[in-house]
């Protein structure tokens, strides 16, 4: 145990927080290219076919990113924008693809929460 005087001279260093999204390297979003678009099943007790894409980011990292919303137009070589944010029931999926940006279309016919899915306001 350190003495008070030692702590006055040299305080304890706070442990650095480990990043939840290391591939973004501190950036809010990153651009990347889809190398594979496929579906995976969630862990128990959920059941579905979740749409994901393997993406090679501009910094060279390759990550698995979730494609949110109903339906998508992504295929191999699509250029996408990646943001952080994990999917709780898909182990290893720590990133989301931003809808309505670059090659990713927004969710057509979406009326609520449109800003999260890249959809314009419908004409009345």
Curated annotation (Swiss-Prot):
Keywords annotated in UniProt: Methylation, Ribonucleoprotein, Ribosomal protein, RNA-binding, rRNA-binding, tRNA-binding
Source taxon at top rank: Bacteria
GO molecular function, one term: structural constituent of ribosome
Renumbered residue ranges of the record's region Disordered: 1-24, 103-124
InterPro entries on file: NA-bd_OB-fold (IPR012340), Ribosomal_uS12 (IPR006032), Ribosomal_uS12_bac (IPR005679)
GO cellular component: small ribosomal subunit
NCBIfam families, alphabetized: rpsL_bact (TIGR00981)
The protein's assembly and partners: Part of the 30S ribosomal subunit. Contacts proteins S8 and S17. May interact with IF1 in the 30S initiation complex.
Family: Belongs to the universal ribosomal protein uS12 family.
Summary of the function given for this chain in its UniProt record: With S4 and S5 plays an important role in translational accuracy.
Protein name: Small ribosomal subunit protein uS12
Species of the source: Coxiella burnetii (strain RSA 331 / Henzerling II)
Lineage: Bacteria, Pseudomonadati, Pseudomonadota, Gammaproteobacteria, Legionellales
């Amino acid at each position: 145990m350190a003495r008070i005087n030692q702590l006055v001279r040299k305080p304890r260093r706070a442990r650095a927080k480990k990043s939840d999204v290391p591939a973004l390297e501190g950036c809010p979003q990153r651009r990347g290219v889809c190398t594979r678009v496929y579906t995976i099943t969630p862990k128990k007790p959920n059941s579905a076919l979740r749409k994901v894409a393997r993406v090679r980011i501009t910094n060279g990292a390759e990550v698995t990113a979730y494609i949110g919303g109903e339906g998508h137009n992504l295929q191999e070589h699509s250029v996408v924008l990646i943001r952080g944010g994990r999917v709780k029931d898909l182990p290893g999926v720590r990133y989301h693809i931003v809808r309505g940006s670059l090659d990713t279309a927004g969710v057509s016919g979406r009326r609520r929460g449109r800003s999260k899915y890249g959809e314009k306001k419908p004409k009345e």
